[in-house]
């Protein structure tokens, strides 16, 4: 079996799949290397012999995790690396190595699934969007703060904005004007996400009319799903691209 890791800025997403047909065996999300090692160590009946990962962390942090995995599980993790082209997709950045690896793999994965023009929106700590032509040419994209960053900035820099996660979750049940601070902040940030997503659709239509696919991924994908009719919600889109970047025999 294969262990796959998506090491983001805030969390590590992991899953174990079969080597023969990529069937999902187990998976989860943790907030630290220690939690990952503990979680994997407690699994029963899910032994893995191979590992591939993508990381947007520093080289030092990534190397530390790779060493820990090698020491603990006697595996040799294969790490995704920047590339000017992959699986028919041409990296659109002027300096291809500066494009975030998780972002790169997400839209490579999306293009692989449809072999046509696509818009990919990833809603995580940050929000990213990317546009890929039917030819595989990446036209570029946008980056803006995600829900966690917007929320935390307001909590950090505005003294009277204080509320807990339970209040935040309750506030998002509806999107009418808020009558409490948590409602006003959470709903306002949610509307900004939705507005961003709808603007991406408008831009994509300027390029391709209605002849394109929409992919949405990331932890907050559910917050925009209803304003993106026909969008494909693919939580593991980065892993689709990771398999293309790091094929294991």
UniProtKB/Swiss-Prot annotation:
Cofactor (UniProt): NH4(+); K(+)
UniProt KW Transport keyword: no
Binding site residues for substrate: 93, 100-103, 181
Pathways involved: Cofactor biosynthesis; coenzyme A biosynthesis; CoA from (R)-pantothenate: step 1/5
Leading EC class: transferase
Keywords from the named record: ATP-binding, Coenzyme A biosynthesis, Cytoplasm, Kinase, Metal-binding, Nucleotide-binding, Potassium, Transferase
GO biological process: coenzyme A biosynthetic process
GO CC term, one of those recorded: cytoplasm
Binding site for ATP: 6-13, 125
Subcellular localization(s) per the UniProt record: Cytoplasm
Superkingdom, natural source: Bacteria
GO molecular function terms attached to this record: ATP binding; metal ion binding; pantothenate kinase activity
Catalysis: reaction(s): (R)-pantothenate + ATP = (R)-4'-phosphopantothenate + ADP + H(+)
Cross-referenced InterPro entries: ATPase_NBD, Type_III_PanK
Catalytic residues, chain numbering: 102 (proton acceptor)
Chief location of this protein within or outside the cell: cytoplasm
EC numbers: 2.7.1.33
Binding site for K(+): 122
Pfam families xrefs: Pan_kinase (PF03309)
Cofactor binding mode and count: A monovalent cation. Ammonium or potassium.
Protein's job: Catalyzes the phosphorylation of pantothenate (Pan), the first step in CoA biosynthesis.
UniProt similarity note: Belongs to the type III pantothenate kinase family.
HAMAP family assigned to the protein according to its UniProt record, in alphabetical order: Pantothen_kinase_3 (MF_01274)
Subunit structure: Homodimer.
Protein name: Type III pantothenate kinase
Species of origin: Pseudomonas syringae pv. tomato (strain ATCC BAA-871 / DC3000)
Gene: coaX
């Amino acid at each position: 079996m294969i262990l796959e890791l998506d090491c983001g800025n805030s969390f590590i997403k992991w899953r174990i799949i079969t080597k023969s047909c990529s069937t999902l065996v187990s998976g989860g999300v943790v907030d630290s290397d220690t939690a990952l090692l503990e979680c994997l160590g407690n699994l029963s009946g899910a032994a893995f012999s191979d590992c591939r990962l993508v990381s947007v962390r520093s080289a030092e942090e990534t190397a530390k995790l790779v060493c820990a995995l090698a020491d603990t599980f006697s595996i040799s993790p294969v790490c995704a690396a920047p590339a000017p082209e992959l699986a028919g997709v041409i990296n659109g950045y002027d300096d291809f190595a500066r494009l975030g690896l998780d972002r790169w793999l997400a839209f490579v994965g999306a293009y692989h699934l449809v072999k046509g023009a696509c818009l990919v929106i990833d809603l995580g700590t940050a929000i990213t969007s990317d546009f890929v032509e039917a030819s595989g040419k990446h036209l570029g994209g946008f980056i803006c703060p995600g829900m966690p960053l917007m929320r935390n900035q307001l909590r950090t820099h505005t003294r009277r904005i204080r509320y807990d996660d339970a209040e935040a979750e309750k506030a998002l049940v509806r999107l009418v004007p808020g009558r409490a601070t948590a409602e006003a902040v959470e709903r306002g940030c949610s509307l900004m996400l939705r507005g961003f997503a709808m603007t991406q659709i408008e831009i994509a239509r300027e390029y391709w009319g209605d002849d394109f696919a929409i992919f949405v991924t990331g932890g907050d994908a559910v917050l925009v799903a209803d304003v993106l009719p026909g969008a494909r919600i693919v939580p593991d889109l980065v892993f689709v691209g990771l398999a293309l970047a790091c094929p294991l025999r």
